[in-house]
């Protein structure tokens, strides 16, 4: 059973993936999204979290991608927790700008450094998205250093 359950969203612009950096817990890049509140559906959660994290944006054409589980990312190596992410993908309407606890918005691509990513993204999400052709990167062009060897 996971210690944390979150909902995340995959937003692409060309071959770039929208990721965020928070101001607490980890310096790694994360998917936009968060924890559902009582009575919220996953899609309600995504709408709320996107407004809180990225300002006046909305999500269109949302579809479920999959659920992934791995260790959560913390800068403190003594903290060991498990994270489960229900991942969706959709089209963003509006310009994302850092808000609330988000300090940076990054368009991550095949030329970006995989060391910036969280364990769940490296170990579970990225390999699945590449194998299913959801990310428009070939394994040859996947983020370095060689993501498959991590």
Q: What are the residue ranges of the model-derived segments?
A:
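Conserved N-terminal beta-strand and adjoining loop/helix that marks the start
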Residues: 1-17, 35
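Active-site-adjacent beta-strand/loop module that shapes the phosphate/pyrophosphate-binding cleft
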Residues: 69-96, 128
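Charged phosphate-binding loop/patch that engages nucleotide di/tri-phosphates or the phosphate backbone
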Residues: 117-150
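Conserved hydrophobic "DFG−1" position in protein kinase catalytic cores
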Residues: 11-12, 19, 90, 107
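Conserved Nudix-box catalytic region and its N-terminal flanking loop in Nudix hydrolases
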Residues: 16-56
């Amino acid at each position: 059973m996971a210690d944390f359950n979150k909902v995340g969203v995959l937003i692409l612009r060309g071959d770039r993936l929208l990721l965020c950096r928070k101001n607490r817990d980890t310096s790694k890049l994360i998917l936009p999204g968060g924890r559902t509140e009582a009575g919220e559906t996953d899609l309600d959660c995504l709408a709320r979290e996107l407004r809180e994290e990225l300002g006046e944006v909305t999500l269109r054409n949302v579809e479920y991608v999959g659920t992934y589980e791995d260790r959560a990312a913390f800068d403190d190596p003594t903290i060991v927790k498990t994270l489960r992410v229900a991942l969706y993908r959709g089209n963003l309407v509006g310009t994302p700008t850092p808000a609330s606890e988000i300090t940076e918005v990054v368009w991550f691509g095949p030329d970006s450094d995989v060391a910036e990513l969280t364990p769940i993204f490296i170990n579970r999400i990225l390999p699945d998205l590449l194998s299913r052709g959801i990310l428009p990167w070939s394994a040859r062009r996947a983020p370095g250093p060689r993501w498959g060897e991590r």
